[in-house]
Amino acid sequence: MGEKLDPELSSDGPHTKSSSKGQGTSTDNAPASKRRCVSTACIACRRRKSKCDGNLPSCAACSSVYHTTCVYDPNSDHRRKGVYKKDTDTLRTKNSTLLTLIQALLNYEEEDAFDLVRQIRSCDNLEDVAQSLVNQEKKSSGWLSNAVIHEENDIAQTDQFESELAGKMSNLVLDGSRKFIGGTSNLIFLPPGSELNEFKPGLATNGDLEGSVTRWTTVTDDQQLISHLLTMYFSWHYPFFTTLSKELFYRDYSRGVPSQYCSSLLVNTMLALGCHFSSWPGAREDPDNSATAGDHFFKEAKRLILDNDELVNSKLCTVQALALMSVREAGCGREGKGWVYSGMSFRMAFDLGLNLESSSLRDLSEEEIDARRITFWGCFLFDKCWSNYLGRQPQFTTANTSVSAVDILPNEESTLWSPYSDMGPSREYAQPSRTRAVADQISQLCKISGDLVVFFYDLAPKEKPSSKQLELKKLSEIHTRLEAWKKGLPKELEPREGQLPQALLMHMFYQLLLIHLYRPFLKYTKSTSPLPQHVSPRKLCTQAAAAISKLLRLYKRTYGFKQICNIAVYIAHTALTIHLLNLPEKNAQRDVIHGLRHLEEMGESWLCARRTLRILDISASKWQVQLPREAVIVFEQTHARWGSWGPWDQAASPSTTSDSPPSVSSQSVVATTDLSQPVSQSAGNQPANPSMGTSPNLTQPVASQYSSTPSGPVSVSAMRAVQRSFSAQLAHNEARQPEPTYLRPVSTSYGPVPSTQSAQEQWYSPTEAQFRAFTAAHSMPTTSAQSPLTTFDTPENLVEESQDWWSRDVNALQLGAEDWTQNWNNGLPTTSADWRYVDNVPNIPSTSAPDADYKPPQPPPNMARPNQYPTDPVANVNSNQTNMIFPGSFQR
């Protein structure tokens, strides 16, 4: 009994003995003490089944005997949970009772709630009241479950009805066309018998396929003309304004079967647009008046809208036709009517649900889904063009749009595109059309354009005006998006020589957005601008305008302006406002002259270009801009040729002032050999050439209207054009009367050019050897062989590349101007000095095709003679200062 125990032995026997011995020893040697009773033992003592004294932080057994870690965990003792179970159940019952009563009071009607309160106040036990409420709820739920089980056989119909009632959208066929019906509409309950027939009896027949093409219009039965105009439309207008499925259209067009992809309204609208790209007599209502191009087909389209009640039956082809009618009216300068047509198109697009993803709709084929998508994104482009053109908020926004991007169809993308003219197709610049790829890129630009216009050009009053920091943040965001778009552009769509016309227009649209982005910041000074010091909004606008001018010159060299969409007129106008701002800088002078000539050429096809010239003419006078001589000449020529645009034009036009009578006197003027009056008038009432701006009465107020600056030198190719033009026209005794526009312009007549001037004709017709000798003596620097658009990487390189040939070395192009004073009145000069007088040659149009790159200037006779200008035409130009007055449109 007295041997020492080993603590490593089993915990039962030895430990018990040791405890007994210890207790015995303690009883013998020390006074007796009662052990403290603890409710919870440590984990080690519970595992050993030994008694624990509950001492903290460690019990005696763990610290003295077993030397183990002592941990107390009351929650781990599951044997004591029954002690609290009764209390827990009681609390849970009370909480459930109170919760049941409170929910009943909240959900009961007013009278029932008062009854329940009285029952609670008079009851002996709240649990009984709560239990009665629970029983009532169980009875109600049991009745609902029995009702559901009873209707299991008709569950499919019930689900359909409930889904139509509770759904956010629905789709049905109404009036023979698919329409979007929203969740709040009751039209979903219309029975199937309410559908109407979409087509008239007898139209939807195959019949004779050979004559099916001529069934679409009553204007003409010339199948060749119809085919020619449609080809014009699909070659020049459709690639940019892609708003329909070409394959589906031609499928039904060739059959002569009206459908949602082809109708007489759509065909006549296409023909009206195709007329603007053709000079065939059948393309004009009046063959002798280019202002009537497409009017006869457009009148037929307007008749069809009323006669066929096209606005009642919403169809894809009607949406497309109305959108095309709107852009055609804009090209004719009738924005009011065009805006209404666009609104009808967009409303019908919403009616058809084109702004929603079509793949979720029922019973739609793949071709119909594709046609709906391409139609919507076409309307999206029309909307953004109208928004920019009129400065109004867009109708389609990203918030109300959930349509996927257009599908790139390999067959259509690989179809060969080639320039098409009145002479037929040309193999030059033939390449894959890439119509859908360009349309997708333009759609991305349109999204950016919409956000730009909404933020910077929304005139609606706001609760809190935009701060400079917010404007800077939004500007940075949109600029980043534009740069990302340009960076992600496929290589085959970059601007280059021979690029697709729609791709060039797309790049012009991109530069237009840059101008619109930075133009609102022109109102700030350098000290008040929120932009960083190194960022100049004027410089960025100038770079974008210069890029547009370069793209227009590239388009002219490649395709000419007879075939170009009218959106280019608006883009050119916007760029010219920036160039006017920068006058009299050399680059601005060049771009203004080129831009006005481009608009003059576009005016042959689009009336809006004629009006744009009048607007720029009046704006330049209002802003007191120093215009180059060539710009003044273009303004006077076009005004004499096309007349005034309206009362607003006549009130401000220099050609309708009191000093300028409407017609020239019929008295004959004797021709002289004095070169101060190189062209004279002759007797008779013969009509004059409208392009000759030589009438003193016509050009009398020019000096008072403009502050003309010396222009740059003229190229040898321009001199050659002048020589050809003048020599060809001297033999003509009669010239055409200026063609009147439908707006009844002010008529101006001129005397014919006398034909008995053999000496001057000889003077203007040097031999080819003399011409080569002259060009060798006055060699000019040539442009780089590099493509003019290969340096579009940075704006700095772009502006640097835009330094054109005539402004690089003005001393090499003075062409003997210093000798004009002494030879001015010495009679007819010899042929060796012919070209010194090239600037005084009137611009008499040649019967042959005009020079593709240059139209010679025609100075008015009352303008100062060349010896009144300094030798260097740009010597006094200060590039850092300008007399330009900011237009009101640039200021908020």
From Swiss-Prot:
Keywords: Activator, DNA-binding, Metal-binding, Nitrate assimilation, Nucleus, Transcription, Transcription regulation, Zinc. Residues 42-70 bind DNA. Residues 1-32, 646-714, 731-761, 842-892 are annotated as: Disordered. It comes from the Eukaryota. Residues 16-27, 649-674 have a biased composition (Low complexity). Residues 675-714, 746-761, 876-892 have a biased composition (Polar residues). It is found in: Nucleus. GO terms for cellular component: nucleus. One of its GO terms (biological process) is nitrate assimilation. One of its GO terms (molecular function) is DNA-binding transcription factor activity. Gene3D superfamilies: Zn(2)-C6 fungal-type DNA-binding domain (4.10.240.10). Pathway-specific regulatory gene of nitrate assimilation; it activates the transcription of the genes for nitrate and nitrite reductases (niaD and niiA). This is Nitrogen assimilation transcription factor nirA. It comes from Emericella nidulans (strain FGSC A4 / ATCC 38163 / CBS 112.46 / NRRL 194 / M139).
